[in-house]
């Protein structure tokens, strides 16, 4: 699976086995915690798996001491099996996207958008850093990085249909990255 396979949403990653009964510790990559606590279909995929494999969620809970979720999935009965899934991606079909509020976006929809500053193409959204406040990572045509906080005042226009967003950073911010 490519990191941006349009058929799947990455919601978490298995970071460790937990206990002896097949529980997994999962780092959350979703804004929807119910993906880790409400039973239902989930898929796991390791780098060596050609396709995601169905492993329905039986139960899950937040593990505050580590900032992770503990999940129990069908087909993973013990620690030995659980350890084979460390590093795997936890996925749901893209059709399972949960509804967003106005002016909220799925990360995957922002990646690849053209970024315009003062009417000129600045670059392309290449990543999003979750640092308390989301920060757009923009790669310019000469492969330099520009970081701009993803807030309405600095990113007033996001047009998914046109594949573009417009930024209005404070004076000097872009130049500080470009030299």
From Swiss-Prot:
It holds the Pfam family PRC_RimM. Residues 102-173 form the PRC barrel domain. GO terms for cellular component: cytoplasm; ribosome. GO terms for biological process: ribosomal small subunit biogenesis; rRNA processing. The keyword Acyltransferase does not apply. InterPro entries: PRC_barrel-like_sf (IPR011033), PRC_RimM (IPR056792), RimM (IPR011961), RimM_N (IPR002676), RimM_N_sf (IPR036976), Transl_B-barrel_sf (IPR009000). Binds ribosomal protein uS19. HAMAP family: Ribosome_mat_RimM (MF_00014). Belongs to the RimM family. An accessory protein needed during the final step in the assembly of 30S ribosomal subunit, possibly for assembly of the head region. Essential for efficient processing of 16S rRNA. May be needed both before and after RbfA during the maturation of 16S rRNA. It has affinity for free ribosomal 30S subunits but not for 70S ribosomes. This is Ribosome maturation factor RimM.
């Amino acid at each position: 699976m490519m990191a941006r396979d349009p058929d799947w949403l990455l919601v978490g990653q298995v970071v460790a086995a937990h206990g002896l009964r097949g529980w997994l510790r999962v780092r959350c990559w979703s804004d929807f915690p119910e993906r880790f606590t409400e039973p239902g279909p989930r898929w796991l995929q390791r780098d060596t798996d050609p396709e995601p494999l169905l492993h329905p969620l039986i139960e899950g809970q937040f593990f505050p001491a580590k900032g992770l979720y503990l999940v129990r999935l069908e087909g993973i009965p013990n620690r030995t099996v659980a350890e084979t899934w460390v590093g795997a991606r936890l996925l749901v079909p893209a059709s399972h996207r949960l509804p967003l509020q106005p002016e909220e976006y799925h990360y995957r929809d922002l990646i690849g958008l053209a970024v315009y500053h003062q009417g000129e193409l600045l670059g392309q959204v290449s990543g999003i850093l979750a640092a308390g406040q989301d920060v757009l990572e923009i790669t310019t045509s000469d492969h330099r990085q520009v970081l701009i906080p993803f807030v309405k005042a600095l990113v007033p226009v996001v047009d998914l249909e046109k594949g573009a967003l417009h930024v209005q950073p404070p004076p000097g911010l872009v130049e500080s990255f470009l030299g």
